[in-house]
Amino acid sequence: MNKLRDKFVDSTVEEERLRENRNHEKYWYRWGPYLSERSWATVREDYSLNGDAWSNFPFEHANARVFRWGEDGLFGVSDNKQLVCMNVALWNGKDERLKERLFGLTGPQGNHGEDVKELYFYLDNTPTHSYMKALYKYPFKKAFPYKELVQKNGERGYEDKEFEVYDIDGLYRDSETGDNPYFDVFFEMAKDDENPSELNFRLTIHNRSKIDSGELYIAPQLFFRNTWAFDGTRTKDKPLLERDAEAANLINMTHKKYGNCQMVFQPSPGGFSSGTNEEEEDKEVEDIDPLLLFTDNESNLVKLFNEEKNPSEYTKDAFEEYLVQGKTDAVNPENKGTKACAVYHFKNIPPGEYVTVRYKFTNDPKNSIFKAQNLAVVDEDEFDLIFDNREEEADNFYWRITPLPISDELRNLQRQAFSGLLWTKQFYNFTYDAWYNGDANVKPRPPPNRANGRNKNWKHLYIEDILSMPDKWEYPFFASWDTAFHCIPLAMIDPEFAKRQLDLLTREWYMHPNGQIPAYEWNFNDVNPPVHAWAVYRVFKIERNMYNREDRTFLERVFQKLLLNFTWWVNRKDTEGKNVFEGGFLGLDNIGVFNRSEPLPTGGTLEQADSTGWMAFFSLQMLNIALELAKENPVYEDIASKFFEHFILISDSMSFEYATDITGEKCKEVIKQNLWNEADKFYYDAISWGDHKVQLPIRSLVGLIPLYASMTLEPSIIKQFRGFKKRVDWFVNNRPEIFDRNIASMSKKGVGERLLLSLVTKERLTAILSRLLDETEFLSPYGIRSLSKYHEKHPFEMNVNGVEYMVKYLPGESDSGMFGGNSNWRGPIWFPTSFLIMEALQRFYLYYGSDFKVECPVGSGDYLNLAEVAEELGYRMIHLFVPDENGERAIHYGDHSKFLSSDPYFRDYVPFFEYFDGDTGRGLGASHQCGWTALVAKWISDVGISCVRLPRTPRSSVATTASTESSEQGPKMKRMARRKSAKSLVNYTATILDLTEEEKRHHRIGGTHSGLTPQSSISSDKARHLMEEMNEEEGIHETVVPEDRHNFETKLIGKLKDKVKNMKVTDKAKDEDIDPMDPMSPLNKDVS
């Protein structure tokens, strides 16, 4: 029974860490990849008068100037308040500077805005950061081309492709020899089995070329974020690093919060000599002992600003001065300070060889660090075993997240998407008062009304949290609508962290007192789409379905704050009180003909189809949550009725507008079309001058967003909430003209007797889909274009006061500097908006069923129901990343980057771009947008099992990160590989939308059954394992595929009870009412 009990109640080691963290038993979140990848040229570090953040703190200052608000670094790790920091520095003996942070162009330097110019990849990470792995590619044959990258990109215009590092011949690839003259620098961190504050680090550096590398300096760093210069504690309680008196490779750390800790740098085994004869080639080089260097994390004001004196004799740039400039007096000879490093000097790494560097940070050195012969040492076998164990535990964890027979390529893609999502966590620190007024101990004081008064209405902001970033180099700041999408894949692997992100943005030190959610640091006042309520409810449902937990406290707490946010929208963005909204920016940058964040050059007001569609969507999400909360608290039933009414009024106003008579009263007899264009069968924005308006006939995402606002009302919900039903019936009976005009099927029952709330009728839905699924309009081979390809030959043009405005289809980069020029919504494919369209189609399918089919693609003669259409769109977007029949990934489209798909040292590493070319799928924008582009991980779980053009049976249960070699390792590989999945589209749809079991039963069509769904819940997975185990003991050898969860659980409980009858139970267990299915019951402790 113990064996069976363990099978049922067991969890992966990583899940157990998450449980310990959730229950405050151990703080596994304490240490993680929380350093930014760019703190220079950010708004927070800008103390200029004119608000020019790009120039006020340039890259050239970063090595010698202290950051006020947060540190950055290569492979950066810190505690959750970023008091103690670690990163890696490299020098190839040729570069003009130490490589301790990633380089890129500022907004003005790039021909398409800011752009990181390095090659690096996130390969692995777990939610507790018990194991992390990343790769940086560092050239050694040539010096890193800092100046050339700036110059070449500066010579290019908006119409040109960007100049990339791999465009430089001989840097990463030699065109003549095919050689790869660079180092692969693999970084790994593994936490101790029991101690969350014992961190083990391992660097493995490969020479990928056919030539000797020459020298390489590796310098792992340990330092404190400089807080003492700003809070008046320059001498009081100042932390200290100093070399140990007995061990030359050991650093002792003293810190007010963390006490006494140590960091030991193990001698490296070295490489091999590249001698000229056989005997010399086989001769092993002696170990490389690290050299410890110390300085202070203080600005070099003398060097940067010609000041007379520095705050400290030893400054932040000391290690670069020492190694690159040869200034041996730059470091502290007393071997102490607030910044330290360990220098490993390798004179050469021969072709194809590698070297390894190991080091450890711990708050409990007595159990893991030993001193011998003037050195501190660690057990290297035990050290490497920790990494083996953590990596195996990560494999087990991710196999449990997606235990499906999907291809190795998809498993690798999903693993890297999750890893990137976790790597892009960052400590975000911002206090408005200190930022705007300056620090008391820092001179000169900031100029009055500096930065043009940026964010002056956000004086309440006080942020010091670990947040999910869109991209830690290009966007090292939170963006509220990005965060909502990040939380969907995050909830699959760490629902607690996902909930924390959504909760934080509504807390009083983030949300404005008027209810507005801050947008992003360049302008917290900008208006992002209202997707927060949707994300909150989706995360709630994902946790319920995957982990069998319902956090109603979270749902209710955030819902209360979202009531404020909804009120802010209604009061501030519906200026004429007509339920038609002029939202402004709404995250879609340049999608309109005018800058939507600024007043119209035409005068009047821009009534936005997407803004009004977003508000209808917001209303339905709030209705969803209110009905969920009303299941246990009837107070919320009244609130649900209120949001139902909001949706009804918004939906009516979006398509129709009453005229008014001379007194200003509505003339019920006269109705004008509003944002829907009956001739074009599409939604358009309109400019309103009060008494008349003009539509702007641009076919863009703006006209597709109304599809988002859809929701099915289940018969059980209508029956359960009588007050809500009464309100619905009143509208149906007393306002029939609204429903007859544009509320889809409120008086007609769909499949399963359910009702549909939607902005679009069946006729309008069909019309919109005829454009959406047309490959000459929105449908790309790789997803959904943001602007119809129709506008390639038919641009929209408008002349206002002699100025020409035009919107033309641009599948690639932007052709202007609008919004920085680094994004484009006039043709490319974007993940967040596509994700919501696909979910909307799934919801429509639940109402209309399999009989409602549309041609997909238009002109193909193939007719699909809406669930199949959603799957087809998912397949297309997944195939942005996976190799085609020629082994090439669409994201690497173009001759200059094809080698990224074919080179054995590149082809398995997947960059997650911000957006994608609408025609070719080429990756564009930020190259590590592992925020919303990580949504691909959810699609893989949803539809990966049936994804075409890929092998469906995995060769391994291990999600490889560097190879697709076959492997026999992994948990229950045979059992997992032989599992079957249900074929019913209802099951796919119910799983994708994270419906409850009750809702799934309501949605079954034609007697279909639930079966094994693509996104198996972890709790259901355990139950099936247990049933299979017991079947095998009884001689039954078959895969368990439960036809009905209730019947399945009944059978399982029966089998367990039969087992219990044959076992000896202690008296204590006999005297209590024991549920054998309860893992916490006394039975599970007392049965022998």
Swiss-Prot record:
A single GO BP: oligosaccharide metabolic process
Note: Present with 2220 molecules/cell in log phase SD medium.
Domain of life: Eukaryota
Protein name listed in UniProt: Uncharacterized protein YMR196W
Compositional bias per record (Low complexity), positions renumbered to this chain: 956-968
A GO cellular-component term linked to this record: cytoplasm
Region Disordered, residue ranges: 954-980, 1063-1088
Disulfide bridge partners, by residue number: none
Gene3D superfamilies xref list: 1.50.10.10
